[in-house]
Amino acid sequence: MTETSPPPVLDTAQARVLGCLIEKEATTPDAYPLTVNAAQVAANQKTAREPVLNLQTGVVHHALRQLETLGLVRQQFSSRAERYEHRLGSVLDLTRQQVALIGLLLLRGAQTLGELYARSERLARFNDADDMRHHLDRLIQRGLAAQLPRASGQREDRYAHLLSGELDVEALQAAAARAAPSARSGSDTSDLEARMQALEATVVELQEALAAVQARLDAAGA
C-alpha cells in the first residue's frame, strides 16, 4: 500500500483485533506478539473498549488470518503457539504516534482531542495537544481518519478512523451522547485501565503456562 492507495475496509472483528495488537505492543510488550487466546481476551476487555464485544475464539482467529491476508498482520511461530503482530505502521507508512491514534480510534470509537491525548500516554509520546492535532490532520489528509461535525450540545470536535468504510455520523453522535453522562475523569480512568490491562495480561500468561504444562503431561502420558 502507498500513501495514495485507498485504506483497507475492516469489519468489526478485524478492527477490534488490529486495535488490540497496536495497544498490547505498547502496554504489554513481554506478552507481544499475541497468541489467539491473548488477542481474544484483549478484544473482549470490559475496559477501554467501545463497544464491549464478546468475540469467540474462531472469530478472532479468522480475523487475524484475514488481517494477515491484507498484509496488516504477520504471524510468528514459537514452540508453544501461533503469535501475531501488526504491521500497520510499515504497511501504511505511519509514524508511531499515528499508529497509536489509529489504535485508540479502532478500540474506542470517535473521541475528542482531549480524550485521545489523555488515553495515548501509554501508547506514544506527543509533545502537546497541538502535536497530536498535527498527526490527526495528517491521518485525515491520508483518508485514514475524519473530523466529525459537532452535534447539538457538543462543545468539542471528535475524530474517527476510516478503516471500516464510510462513517455513520448519526450513530456516532448518538453513541457519544449516551457515553457522556457516565464519563469519568481522564486520570482516574487511565489509572483503572492500566491496572485492568496488567491483570488481564497476567491472566493470559497464566492460561498459556497452564496449557503448556497440560501439553507436556499429555505427551508424557501418550
Swiss-Prot record:
It comes from the Bacteria. It holds the Pfam family DUF480. Signal peptide: none annotated. InterPro entries: DUF480 (IPR007432), WH-like_DNA-bd_sf (IPR036388), WH_DNA-bd_sf (IPR036390). Belongs to the UPF0502 family. This is UPF0502 protein XAC4278. It comes from Xanthomonas axonopodis pv. citri (strain 306).
